[in-house]
Amino acid sequence: MSPTGSPATPALRHRTVLLDEAVEALVWRPDGVYVDGTFGRGGHSRAVLARLGPDGALVAFDKDPAAIAEAGTIQDARFSIEHESFAAMGERLAGRGHVAGVLLDLGISSPQIDEAARGFSFRFEGPLDMRMDTTRGITAAEWLAQAEEQDIARVIRDYGEERFAVQIAKAIVARRREPGDGGPLATTADLAALVAKAVKTREKGQDPATRTFQALRIHINQELEDLERGLKAAYDLLQVGGRLVVISFHSLEDRIVKRFMAAHARPQQDADPALRRAPLRAADLPQPTLRLLGRVKPGAQEVADNPRARSAVMRVAEKLAPAASGRGAAPA
């Protein structure tokens, strides 16, 4: 998928990032049950199905009704899809036992960015919606029309890492009080113009609205909360030897993924001062339950072919048996 506001590609075109690398890392047994937590337009799912044998199965998840419609074009008895966030995979798959692998391709897809009516990008004028699931929840415009100034500033600061968050929040609230052509923000163009006035300096090569749009999208869709829940659910569902493959597109996502994997890849007494002081034998110490298999970034050719891939980072881990020994070395 992709970060918000990247350079536009032809309308509604989508190129799956790290396609071969992700599927190679994920599928280790052709008769396993796998989860594609972010179906999108089905690039990874179709490639996974091509690798599975007749006894394999793939369960996909997606919030976006357009993705669910696209999934309907896959006529394969081994495939099913849930119109739900991947954060709910634990509940949805509770009766299916353990799975052989889980893939999460985070962020936003090119069709979502390039469809003006979705309101994800400042490059196209449209309603300020930003919902992944257009059938539920409030839009970005609705939230900005009612949120407290300090809450708006916090979201833009924490999720956009925007140093002008306070100024932007003040401008948004002031705009709500304006008569005539003022009032609450309604379109992507409204928000982009307001941010451009509030941000006093420009980062080279980046539109001043980039961080604000990212922050609002993350907040409206609860992306980081879903990621934390989804990682735990995936870990609990994985069988021994199962693979967790996560592709992230910005530092907030990657930081959560890296910390989650690292926490399970080192003996757990590292985080418990009492255990560190206890005179335990090595055999008595908590053992790692994930082995880190690497960190992959797109090659130069993929980035040249698909500029939206440039910020992608893929991390891979393998579930270990509870009594497994050894320490996974976390890549940088």
UniProtKB/Swiss-Prot annotation:
Cross-referenced PANTHER family: 12S RRNA N4-METHYLCYTIDINE METHYLTRANSFERASE, S-ADENOSYL-METHYLTRANSFERASE MRAW
Q: Which UniProt keywords apply?
A: Cytoplasm, Methyltransferase, rRNA processing, S-adenosyl-L-methionine, Transferase
* Superkingdom: Bacteria
In terms of Pfam families, this protein maps to:
Methyltransf_5 (PF01795)
The yes or no answer to whether the keyword Cell wall biogenesis/degradation is present is no
Instruction: Supply one GO BP term.
Output: rRNA base methylation
Matching SUPFAM superfamilies, A to Z? Putative methyltransferase TM0872, insert domain, S-adenosyl-L-methionine-dependent methyltransferases
User: What range does the record give for the signal peptide?
Assistant: none
Which family does the similarity line name? Belongs to the methyltransferase superfamily. RsmH family.
UniProt GO cellular component terms: cytoplasm
Query: Where in or outside the cell?
Result: Cytoplasm
What EC number(s) would the UniProt record show? 2.1.1.199
Top enzyme class:
transferase
Which reaction equation describes what this protein catalyses? cytidine(1402) in 16S rRNA + S-adenosyl-L-methionine = N(4)-methylcytidine(1402) in 16S rRNA + S-adenosyl-L-homocysteine + H(+)
What is the designated name of this protein?
Answer: Ribosomal RNA small subunit methyltransferase H
Q: What does this protein do?
A: Specifically methylates the N4 position of cytidine in position 1402 (C1402) of 16S rRNA.
What are the top taxonomic ranks of the organism?
Bacteria, Pseudomonadati, Pseudomonadota, Betaproteobacteria, Burkholderiales
Q: Which GO terms describe its molecular function?
A: rRNA (cytosine-N4-)-methyltransferase activity
Q: Which cysteines are joined by disulfide bonds?
A: none
Q: Which residues bind S-adenosyl-L-methionine?
A: 42-44, 62, 86, 105, 112
- Cross-referenced InterPro entries: RsmH (IPR002903), SAM-dep_MeTrfase_MraW_recog (IPR023397), SAM-dependent_MTases_sf (IPR029063)
Quote the Gene3D superfamilies the UniProt record gives: Putative methyltransferase TM0872, insert domain, Vaccinia Virus protein VP39
